[in-house]
Curated annotation (Swiss-Prot):
It catalyses: Endonucleolytic cleavage of RNA, removing extra 3' nucleotides from tRNA precursor, generating 3' termini of tRNAs. A 3'-hydroxy group is left at the tRNA terminus and a 5'-phosphoryl group is left at the trailer molecule. Belongs to the RNase Z family. Zinc phosphodiesterase, which displays some tRNA 3'-processing endonuclease activity. Probably involved in tRNA maturation, by removing a 3'-trailer from precursor tRNA. This is Ribonuclease Z. The active site is at 66 (proton acceptor). GO terms for molecular function: 3'-tRNA processing endoribonuclease activity; zinc ion binding. It comes from Prochlorococcus marinus (strain MIT 9312). Homodimer.
Amino acid sequence: MNITFLGTSSGVPSLTRNVSSLALKLSQSSEVWLFDCGEGTQHQIMKSNIKSSQIKKIFITHMHGDHIYGLPGLLATLGLSGNSNGIEIYGPLGLRSFISSALSSSFCKLSFPLHFVEVENFASENKILFENNKLKVNCACLKHKIPAYGYRVSEKDKPGIFDIKKAESMKIAPGPIYSKLQQGKEVLLPDGRTVNGKEFCGPPRKGESFVYCTDTVFSESAVSLSKNADLLVHESTFSQEDESMAYEKLHSTTIMAAKTALLSNTKKLIITHLSPRYTSKNSITPSDLLKEAQKVFPNTHLAKDFLVADIK
């Protein structure tokens, strides 16, 4: 799996950073899952390696405008492309009415269904939000001025590496049988032999895990959600120097984001959602924010628009 940052600014766009959005490209299918959709997201998609037609799920963290104002326009555009299977939209209470109002007020009728899932109960009761045979999604309540939620996407463990030479040495002909064996299934061969796929596979390979936390001040629930994750994307609106503002506005500093990664035993941290006050021309720059976080959690990286990062 990999992610593409479509917007990395906090609150308002800047000349170099759009407001929040991130696309997750699944490794086991052609699907793309979108996390947040600030104003201008569809323009960012057009400039990126993402195809909007592949978006099947959208996860919204909270109802502030810099995370949702791009949704109605994106959905309207997707309607023109004839997405007949529909889109699943996960998010807070009020998201459905916001989208419905925006679309109906502009006399927009979509050519595909929207399937809404309100996440509050899933977060408060620690229930799985979505699951199939390859992935599961969990969410957790964050600490912001309005209800906000973090999301975790976890791949299930994958079969071990298939030993082709062993199969060939046992005179098992290549073909669909190899696929079944790789899945660890018991297979009846044309010559009457029964073989167990587990004998041909190495140990299971650990699935990848990705966590997205914004907007929030430091939160123990974010630490729990991120436990042993391969990649944590965490908001870092303020520098440590502006910690008082972070507590006032319930956003995170660089140190809070790094502390979350450290306490959760996350392998890699990428900080995003930077305040536009930090530019290369100001006394505190984005590079300074990165250095602050790296003092606490060395494997920290700085998000920028259109950055593509592997989960592992």
